Amino acid sequence: MNIIDQLEQEQLRLDMPDFRAGDAIKVHVKIREGEKERIQIFAGVVIKKTKGLACARFTVRKISGGIGVERIFPLNSPSIDKIEVVTRGRVRRSKIYYLRNLRGKAARIKERRMA
């Protein structure tokens, strides 16, 4: 194992839940304002998850005031306090970019049954 792989293994976070595209999640992000630090919740649907060790990231989309907002989070970021999986969605694609063009009821995702 070379030095780069060893450094990436040290930076990995093992406390993240298992989720994938289509899942509705809440991301608790640490926001620093001046000398204060607070937690802000970004809730939405995962539309993309890229794999990798230290460079893994995921994109969450939500509708805020009738406008779609997407935010990209590094999975191993220290600014993420925790991730909650609200519902598990059933989709047939790993990247669900088609949600960007859908509105209203058409943008709903069926819930995956956990057996």
UniProtKB/Swiss-Prot annotation:
InterPro entries: Ribosomal_bL19 (IPR001857), Ribosomal_bL19_CS (IPR018257), Ribosomal_bL19_sf (IPR038657), Translation_prot_SH3-like_sf (IPR008991)
Ranges annotated as spanning the membrane: none
Keyword Ribonucleoprotein annotated: yes
Matching PROSITE patterns: RIBOSOMAL_L19 (PS01015)
GO terms for MF: structural constituent of ribosome
Gene3D superfamilies on file: 2.30.30.790
GO biological process terms, semicolon-separated: translation
A Gene Ontology cellular-component term: cytosolic large ribosomal subunit
UniProt keywords, alphabetically: Ribonucleoprotein, Ribosomal protein
Pfam families recorded: Ribosomal_L19 (PF01245)
PANTHER family reported in the protein's UniProt record: LARGE RIBOSOMAL SUBUNIT PROTEIN BL19M, RIBOSOMAL PROTEIN L19
Known role: This protein is located at the 30S-50S ribosomal subunit interface and may play a role in the structure and function of the aminoacyl-tRNA binding site.
Protein name: Large ribosomal subunit protein bL19
Encoding gene per record: rplS
